[in-house]
Amino acid sequence: MKKFLKLTLAVALMACSSSVFAQKFGRVDLAAIIPNMSEYKEASANLESYAKDLQDQLEAIQVEFNNKLAEYEKTAGTISDSVKQLKESELQQLQQRYRDFSTIAQQDLSNKENELMTPVFELANEAVKKIAQAGGYLIVFNTANAAASGIAYFDEAALTDVTAEVKRELNVVDAQ
């Protein structure tokens, strides 16, 4: 009985150890894929257009402020103190409006970037997942941001590069 127990334990240990060694690990360079995706290019163009609209609005406030400031400086010597105070108050309000709009525009731009880019990154991650599952990979490392993810070192040569497979899955062609 003891021999049977030892034999069973030995077989179980060998089965466990062989399954550990049979695991496949891959790597992918998403930085080489995502910028070439048509979805990324479209999202980037939309984000750039949105940023330009916000910048145009900000510049319009700046132009309005500059015009009112020039008018104030031109007439400052000829207007009453009460009108001066009114114009100064108006200028301060415009400055505050500029600062407020600038802050809101930065937040809006960040939100818009998340809104536009999140689906692109999700699409890329889904393609990696599909390739990993089809290829039997336990883990696929993104070499583009390995250090940022807390991985101090890994031997890239020991990992199977699945970048080309992910590109094919996403119909990505490298930019020329």
Q: Language-model features: where?
A:
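Bacterial N-terminal signal peptides that target proteins for export
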Residues: 1-8
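Amphipathic, charged alpha-helical segments and their helix-to-coil junctions
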Residues: 23-176
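Bacterial N-terminal signal peptides
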Residues: 8-16
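Sec/Tat signal peptide C-region and signal peptidase I cleavage site
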Residues: 16-22
